[in-house]
C-alpha cells in the first residue's frame, strides 16, 4: 500500500502539540498512537537503595514517588537498559523536591523541579541512591513519554440553510479541529481551507455560524493528533521516535518473510 | 499524605503545581477561585484538576505519631 500522506501542525509547543495527518488509515493512526504511548522509551527511577529514611513515609512509598518523577532523556545517546545513578539527601525541617535529585550524568535530570517528594520535620532525614533505567511504556507506565495521546477525525462543517426565526436556540457543541469550508457564512475573518480549533469559538458552532443550520461530517482519512509529553523530551521527538519504531518493525517483518 | 506526583488517570505531572495551588486557594488571605488558578497553572483536564482540588496534606497530622 503506497499512499501519499501529508503532515501539518495545528499547534506546536515544547510539551503540547496538535498535528494534522492526511492520507492515513484509521488503523495506522491508532498504530502511531500506540507507539507513542508504549514504544518510546524514557528514563525513570527503577531501583532505590535507602541509606536513611526517618520520614513519615515507608521506603516503598518514597520509591514509587521517585519513580514517577519525569527525567530528561536524550535518545541519541542511550539505549534501552542503560542505567544512570541519582542521589538524594535532604535534612529536615524542609521538603525534599525533585530538584534535590543529583544525577551522575548531566543529561539525565528531573524534568520538573518543583515536585514535592516528602515533607521532612525536625530531626527527620532522607538519603537515598537510585538507579534510573531507560525502558518503554510497555514495561511500566512510569516509562511512558506521551501523556494523554489521542486523535480525532478532522471535521468539516457544511451550511445547509438558515435557522428558522422561532427555532430552539440550543448550543451546538463541537470539539476538535475543523477545516473551514463555508467561510462566507462564518463570523469574523475566515478563509476556506483554514484549520480552526473549536476552542477558538468556544466549542459552540452557533458562535461560528450565527443563524445558520449546519451539518458536521468527518474528513475521510484525516486525523488530528493531540500529543503531550511529560517533559522527558519534546513532542516532536516523541512523534518521530514513535514513527521510527513502527518503521523498524515493518522492515523487520519484511525481511523475515522474504524468500 | 503527600500530593500525588502524577494524575492517576492520564499520567500528567500535577505535583509540581501543588504548592502554588495550595498557597493561592487555601492559605492566602483572600483565597482565589480554584477554577481560575487551575486554568492559569495549565491544568486543563478534569482528571488532573480533581487531583489537586481533592487533595489534603496529612504529613503534619501523622508526624507526631512516629
Curated annotation (Swiss-Prot), chain A:
Top-rank lineage group of the source organism? Archaea
Its Enzyme Commission number(s) read 2.7.7.6
Q: Name one GO cellular component term.
A: cytoplasm
Principal location class: cytoplasm
Q: Which reaction does it catalyse?
A: RNA(n) + a ribonucleoside 5'-triphosphate = RNA(n+1) + diphosphate
GO annotation, biological process: DNA-templated transcription
Return the Pfam families for the record.
RNA_pol_A_bac (PF01000), RNA_pol_L (PF01193)
Similarity comment text for this entry:
Belongs to the archaeal Rpo3/eukaryotic RPB3 RNA polymerase subunit family.
The UniProt entry, under PANTHER family, shows: DNA-DIRECTED RNA POLYMERASE, DNA-DIRECTED RNA POLYMERASE II SUBUNIT RPB3
State the protein's name: DNA-directed RNA polymerase subunit Rpo3
Provide the species name: Haloarcula marismortui (strain ATCC 43049 / DSM 3752 / JCM 8966 / VKM B-1809) (Halobacterium marismortui)
What gene, per UniProt, encodes this protein?
rpo3
Swiss-Prot record, chain B:
Main subcellular location: cytoplasm
Names of required cofactors: Zn(2+)
Q: Where in the cell is it found?
A: Cytoplasm
What GO terms fall under cellular component here? Answer: cytoplasm; DNA-directed RNA polymerase complex
* Enzyme Commission code(s) on record: 2.7.7.6
Reaction(s) this enzyme catalyzes, per UniProt: RNA(n) + a ribonucleoside 5'-triphosphate = RNA(n+1) + diphosphate
How does the cofactor bind to this protein, according to its record?
Binds 1 zinc ion.
Q: Name one GO molecular function term.
A: DNA-directed RNA polymerase activity
UniProt GO BP: DNA-templated transcription
Q: Give the matching NCBIfam families.
A: PRK04016.1
Q: Tell me its family.
A: Belongs to the archaeal Rpo10/eukaryotic RPB10 RNA polymerase subunit family.
Protein's name in the database: DNA-directed RNA polymerase subunit Rpo10
Amino acid at each position: 500500500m503506497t499512499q501519499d500522506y501529508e503532515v501539518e501542525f495545528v499547534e506546536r509547543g515544547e510539551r503540547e502539540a496538535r498535528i494534522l495527518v492526511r492520507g492515513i488509515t484509521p488503523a495506522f493512526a491508532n498504530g502511531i498512537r500506540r507507539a507513542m504511548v508504549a514504544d518510546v522509551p524514557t528514563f525513570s527511577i527503577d531501583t532505590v537503595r535507602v541509606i536513611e529514611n526517618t520520614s513519615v513515609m515507608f521506603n516503598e512509598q518514597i520509591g514509587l514517588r521517585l519513580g514517577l518523577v519525569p527525567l530528561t532523556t536524550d535518545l541519541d545517546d542511550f539505549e534501552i537498559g542503560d542505567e544512570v545513578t541519582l542521589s538524594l539527601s535532604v535534612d529536615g525541617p524542609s521538603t525534599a523536591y525533585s530538584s534535590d535529585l543529583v544525577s551522575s550524568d548531566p543529561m539525565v535530570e528531573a524534568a520538573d523541579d518543583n515536585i514535592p517528594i516528602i515533607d521532612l520535620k525536625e530531626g527527620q532525614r532522607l538519603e537515598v541512591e537510585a538507579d534510573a533505567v531507560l525502558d518503554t511504556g510497555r514495561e511500566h507506565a512510569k516509562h511512558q513519554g506521551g501523556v494523554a495521546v489521542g486523535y480525532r477525525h478532522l471535521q468539516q462543517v457544511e451550511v445547509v440553510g438558515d435557522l428558522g426565526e422561532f427555532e430552539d436556540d440550543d448550543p451546538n457543541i463541537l470539539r476538535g479541529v475543523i477545516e473551514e469550508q463555508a467561510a462566507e457564512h462564518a463570523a469574523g475573518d475566515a478563509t476556506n481551507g483554514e484549520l480552526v480549533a473549536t476552542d477558538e469559538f468556544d466549542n459552540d458552532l452557533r458562535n461560528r455560524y450565527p443563524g445558520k443550520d449546519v451539518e458536521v461530517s468527518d474528513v475521510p482519512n484525516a486525523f488530528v493528533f493531540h500529543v503531550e509529553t511529560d517533559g522527558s523530551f519534546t513532542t516532536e521527538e516523541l512523534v518521530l521516535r514513535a514513527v521510527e519504531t513502527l518503521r523498524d518493525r515493518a522492515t523487520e517483518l519484511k525481511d523475515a518473510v522474504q524468500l | 499524605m503527600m500530593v500525588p506526583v502524577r494524575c492517576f488517570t492520564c499520567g500528567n505531572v500535577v505535583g509540581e503545581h501543588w504548592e502554588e495551588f495550595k498557597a493561592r486557594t487555601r492559605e492566602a488571605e483572600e483565597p482565589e477561585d480554584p477554577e481560575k488558578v487551575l486554568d492559569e497553572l495549565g491544568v486543563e483536564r478534569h482528571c488532573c484538576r480533581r487531583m489537586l482540588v481533592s487533595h489534603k496534606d496529612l504529613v503534619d497530622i501523622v508526624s507526631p505519631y512516629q
